[in-house]
């Protein structure tokens, strides 16, 4: 899959912060960052562990992705649903130690993230707040949540992003990741070559990637 803008939301679930290993205060505002297309691979393509020291804190983040279907600027939360085309599955690959000095650097290693393989249209979902997200690392369940656990709703995320720039059809918003990433575990469990990552969102084909 490809998209125009890859917009990601940080700290959108109550959880242990995988960068610092502690419970952060609840954010008062939506935290946004972006990803380059070069950081993304598709379903069944290999995710590459970064070279050198970055490999020691390479982590996964299963997320629900929202695909924009209608152009908009300064969208109100009450009208945001009109601008959704559908939903998909996203893995926000992250190098935790690099995040400490630069979110952009920590989130944009080449071939570190993935999304897909399919999009389910919004009319196929009765209530998007009940979308269930699960992540499996080597068949072990490590993340399990629903969209109604988000701190900022999907509508609020769309509205906020649209105050910064015009949203276009094909833009993607990755809506944040719940507890259970490797950096929040004790002991930490970061990705290594040979791992298999599987992320599911209800109603969609699982996103599966080998880690090499």
Which residue ranges define each predicted feature?
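Active-site microenvironments in enzyme catalytic cores
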Residues: 1-141, 210
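Catalytic-pocket segment enriched in acidic/His residues
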Residues: 16, 96-212
């Amino acid at each position: 899959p490809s998209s125009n803008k890859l917009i990601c939301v940080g700290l959108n679930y109550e959880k242990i912060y995988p960068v610092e290993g502690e419970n952060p205060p609840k954010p008062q505002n939506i935290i946004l960052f972006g990803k380059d297309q070069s950081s993304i691979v598709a379903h069944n393509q290999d995710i590459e562990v970064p070279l050198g020291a970055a490999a020691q804190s390479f982590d996964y983040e299963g997320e629900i992705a929202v695909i924009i279907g209608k152009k908009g600027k300064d969208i109100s939360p009450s009208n945001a649903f009109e601008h959704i085309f559908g939903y998909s599955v996203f893995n926000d690959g992250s190098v935790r130690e690099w995040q400490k000095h630069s979110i952009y650097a920590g989130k944009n290693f080449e071939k570190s993230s993935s999304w897909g393989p399919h999009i389910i249209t919004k009319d196929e979902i009765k209530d998007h707040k009940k979308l269930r997200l699960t992540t499996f690392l080597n068949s072990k369940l490590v993340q399990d949540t629903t969209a109604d656990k988000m701190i900022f709703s999907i509508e609020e995320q769309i509205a906020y992003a649209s105050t910064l720039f015009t949203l276009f059809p094909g833009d993607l918003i990755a809506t944040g990741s719940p507890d259970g990433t490797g950096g929040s575990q004790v002991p930490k469990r970061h990705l290594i070559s040979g791992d298999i990552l599987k992320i599911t969102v209800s109603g969609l084909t699982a996103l599966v990637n080998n880690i090499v």
